[in-house]
Amino acid sequence: SIVSHAQGLGYSPRSKTSSQTNVNLTLNLAGVSNRNTTYTLPAFTLFTTSINDITYTFQTTESLTATDNGSGLYEFSDVNGNKNVILFEGTKRTKKFYVGKVGERQIYVIPDSTMDTATTIVKVFANPSTTEFEPYTPISKAIRVDQNSKFYQITEAPNGFYELNFGDGISFGQAPETGTVVQVEYLSTVGADANGGQVFSP
């Protein structure tokens, strides 16, 4: 097929892309007694904006922290101290796959045509009841790959959706083991329709 031929050439068609906006987030507690020294804004905190009377949802994709400047003003920043915070349009969605027996063909297709593949986060849990997980990294960010590397690749499936692929212990790293749970988190987006927002409200 055209899709498989394109993948053989190292190409995978782009998915929809979430609109992004840069904002400065502040919290003013001047005059408030017993305020905390530091506040945290969790990842996936929601904001909304309206364009032509249509409301769109944006959100953070990482936790942000802010420290009292001494006057009750807090400016939120990311882990690198950057106060120019990026909000992404979209709705967070989660898909889980249970890894079958060795030798079985494992298929991890995300049946969502609105997926922004660039926002994908892949976590592998040892079993369905644990909260601890191993993060997997996009193969595009690999510097060195061996049989123990934990990478994933997203390609287009024949039905037009996107498929998650792992290594086999030889090609591009380690595949999730039998009995583990693969959890995929991503943003479902409307694409360019959400461009142009000016005012964002929590």
Q: Predicted segment positions?
A:
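Signature of Asx- and small-polar-rich beta-strand/turn repeats characteristic
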Residues: 1-202
